[in-house]
Swiss-Prot record:
Its cofactor is Mg(2+). Signal peptide: none annotated. One of its GO terms (biological process) is ribosome biogenesis. The gene is obg. Residues 160-327 form the OBG-type G domain. Monomer. It comes from Cereibacter sphaeroides (strain KD131 / KCTC 12085) (Rhodobacter sphaeroides). An essential GTPase which binds GTP, GDP and possibly (p)ppGpp with moderate affinity, with high nucleotide exchange rates and a fairly low GTP hydrolysis rate. Plays a role in control of the cell cycle, stress response, ribosome biogenesis and in those bacteria that undergo differentiation, in morphogenesis control. Residues 1-159 form the Obg domain. Keywords: Cytoplasm, GTP-binding, Hydrolase, Magnesium, Metal-binding, Nucleotide-binding. GO terms for molecular function: GTP binding; GTPase activity; magnesium ion binding. GTP binds at residues 166-173, 191-195, 212-215, 279-282, 308-310. One of its GO terms (cellular component) is cytoplasm. This is GTPase Obg.
Amino acid sequence: MKFLDLCKVYIRSGGGGGGCVSFRREKFIEFGGPDGGDGGNGGSVWAEAVDGLNTLIDFRYQQHFFAKSGQPGMGSQRTGRSGDDIVLKVPVGTEIIDEDEETVIADLTEVGQRVLLAQGGNGGWGNLRFKSSTNRAPARANPGQPGIDRTIWLRLKLIADAGLLGLPNAGKSTFLSATSNARPKIADYPFTTLVPNLGVVGVDGKEFVIADIPGLIEGASEGRGLGDQFLAHVERCSVLLHLVDGTSSTIVKDYRTIIGELEAYGGDLALKPRITAMNKIDAMDSKQISDRRRALEKATGGKVFTISGVAGTGLMDVLRALWAEIDGARGDKVEEHAPWQP
């Protein structure tokens, strides 16, 4: 399935049906009085987060969603049929943004979460509604309210607990394949990964979701390489795992390149908890591992894990460190949403 994480959609709610002007006509009843029914309500447009989707590709082939209008009222106090609602089914993690591309209308982060995008117009009143003690035979009815035209953007931000960062060929896809159920494409050339991949990782009986995004290069924030468009998919992560290629002769520069791109991207991404791991130690001797780890720890100001995605060395230590951060973040969220108790 092709991956699409941003699309423009045009929606319109249905207009309300017009009210009816009608008078009761029966044998031997000369003045039957008004009996015009109301018009039906127009259909509304909703968005709903559903399980089983991880792309917006369906909206590439259909961008226009117009709800049906309500039917006009009829005589004998019959109300017109209301228009059916339209529901846009989107993946969990979809942001709905106004046409200005800045105002967030809704952020659908849970299965079943719904938001009303365009309310259908109310049906007009029939002349029966206007009957009064002074006007026994009103000959007026209301037209239905018009529908609402709206242009919106859908932006998908995948929901994962941990995000994988690094330069192209840092071994992110190999790490994901070695630690999870994901099977991303792996090859010895840059930008093998072109779209984000998700994998479920198990460690000590616990599970969490990790996201692998295409590699960043220097200047990604300015559009070089694949740009920084995929960084949106790790914005929701509790922790970031920064993989650095240990066989690189510019290991410190490589590390700082990614940090610089995180800072250029903006938001809170550069402030997220981050774990650094030096990868590909299976292709290094002990002195190289020691020297480059020391240089990297000096640059990061913290601990650096040494791992090999190919050989499986050191992976469990990294996964446990990731889980510790994720577990702490989940606990904080539970406390935030806990009801107040005296």
